[in-house]
Amino acid sequence: RYIRRQRQMCIRDSYETGPGKDRRFDLEPSHQPGAPRIRRLNSPVDHHREYWDFASEGPFVEIAEDLLGPDVKFHHSKLNFKWGDGGEEVKWHQDIQFWPHTNYEVLTLGVYLDDVDPTMAPMGIIPGSHNGPLFDLYDESDTWTGNISENDLTLLELDSAEYLSGPAGTVTVHNCRCVHGSAPNLSSRSRPLFLCAYSAAHALPITDLTRGGKYSETIVRGKAARWAKFDSRPVLLPPDWSKTRHKSIFEHQQNEN
C-alpha cells in the first residue's frame, strides 16, 4: 500500500512543475513542464502526509531501531527521480560532510518505488568504506564540490562497488560514512528512490541545514537523549549555508550556478 501510494504521488509530482523556481524541486537544466526532467523532490515528508506516515510509522523505523538502538530521530527526506534517458550521475561522495553530527550513528534508508535493474544506474556502495577515511569534499581552491576528488578516488577500491538493484519495495541502507554514488541513467525508465535519514537520539546535528524541515529532529522511536555522544574522529564542516545559499548535491557536483 505504501509503495503504491508513493508511486502515484511520484508521478503526480513530476507534472506539477511549471515556469519559475520552486525550491521543492531540483530540476535538470533541460527540464520543461511538458517534458519533465526532475532530479529531486526536496523533503517530500513536508509536502505529502503519506510520505511522513511511511517515514515515521513504516518499516524504515523498525530497521533504524535495529541498527541505531532504541532511541531514533528522523533527520530529513528526499525523493531522487533519476530520470530515464540520461538522468544525471551522482559522483562518489559521503553524506555526513553535508550535515555533520556529533557522531556517526547516522544512516540513510531508501526504497525503490519501481523495479530497478542494473541498466537503470542503481546506487552503488563501496563495502567497508564506512570504516575508512572521511574525505575532503572541497577542491584545491577551497570550493565545495560535494564529491570525492579524483586523487582521493585512487585510495578506494571502486571495482568492489555493489550496485543495489531489485524490485519495487527493495530497501537500501547505508551509513553516513559510506562512499556511494550512481552513474547516469541511460535506460528509458526512471528510477525513483525515496530516501530518509535517521540518527541515534544522542547524535546531534552540528549545522542547521535541515532545521527548517517540519519534522527534522523528531523522535520516531524511543525518547529524546539527555546526553550527547561525541565521536573522537573529526568531521569535515561544509560551508556556512546561512551565508552561502545551499544548492543541491547535483548543482554542486555539476558546478551549476
Model-predicted regions and their roles:
Residues K78, W83, Q94, V111-D115, ...:
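Short, structured patches in soluble enzyme cores that scaffold and shape functional sites
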Residues F81-D95, C176-G181:
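Conserved short histidine dyad/triad with adjacent acidic residue
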